[in-house]
Regions:
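Cleaved targeting-peptide boundary
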Residues: 28-36
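Extracytoplasmic/secreted envelope proteins and their assembly/folding machinery
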Residues: 57-61, 65-68, 144-148
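Sec-exported extracytoplasmic/periplasmic mature domains
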Residues: 65-73, 152, 156
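Glycine-rich, aromatic-bearing surface loops/beta-hairpins
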Residues: 137, 146-193
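Short, intrinsically disordered low-complexity segments
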Residues: 76-108
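Acidic/histidine-rich, surface-exposed loop or edge segments in extracytoplasmic proteins
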Residues: 36-52, 119-135
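N-terminal signal peptide c-region/cleavage motif recognized by signal peptidases
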Residues: 23-26
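Bacterial N-terminal signal peptides that target proteins for export
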Residues: 2-16
Length: 193
């Protein structure tokens, strides 16, 4: 059954579709744009307080290093395990890490400080608690919660997507998601020989 559509309605519908397409295009180009950013040192003091998963001090330090690098921390970061009572490789009640992490911060309206060298950066989505590894994400449920509240604020982020059905002492497969857009350096292209 064909419904009669007036020319006015047809033009209005075309205008809405065109505006939506232009809006999506403008948003995509804004997301792809480079921004000027500077490395900023931030102190890190993190203690894991979970009941379901247990970490050794070195295991937590390795896991946190991976998360910090994934979020865009400069690779020269150094973490020191703290609160270690179980010995090397043995689970500890409340393991932690401390150190200084260099993260990218967008250059403000005033510009960079005289001792800071700006570099080109862009926003990139990272997934900290992946949906593709449900058992690993279930074990890291409490860690993901603490990363969201204690680690993400150290970074320039946007579009944070977090969902958790964490229950202490239980693995909830597929119950945790943590993703965010973070600033990362634009890869440097090497000149051709």
């Amino acid at each position: 059954m064909d419904l009669p559509i007036s020319n006015r309605a047809r033009h209005a519908l075309s205008a809405v579709v065109a505006a939506a397409c232009l809006g999506v295009s403008a948003q995509a180009s804004a997301d792809d744009a480079t921004v000027q950013a500077v490395w900023t040192a931030k102190p890190l003091h993190f203690t894991f307080m979970g009941f379901t998963a247990k970490y050794s001090c070195d295991g937590l330090a390795d896991r946190m290093r991976g998360i910090l690098l994934l979020l865009g921390a400069r690779p020269d970061l150094k973490l020191t395990p703290v609160g270690c009572s179980g010995g090397f490789g043995r689970p500890t009640q409340f393991p932690g890490v401390t150190g200084t992490v260099n993260v990218l911060e967008p250059v403000g309206e005033k510009g960079p400080a005289p001792d800071q060298k700006p570099l080109a950066a862009h926003w990139q989505q990272v997934v900290v608690a992946p949906r593709g590894e449900p058992l690993k994400a279930a074990g890291d449920c409490e860690l993901s919660e603490q990363v969201k509240t204690s680690i993400l604020p150290l970074f320039a982020t946007r579009n944070i997507a977090y969902n958790s059905t964490c229950i202490p002492h239980q693995l909830t497969v597929g119950g945790t998601q943590l993703a965010a857009d973070v600033l990362v350096p634009v890869p440097q292209t090497e000149p051709a020989p």
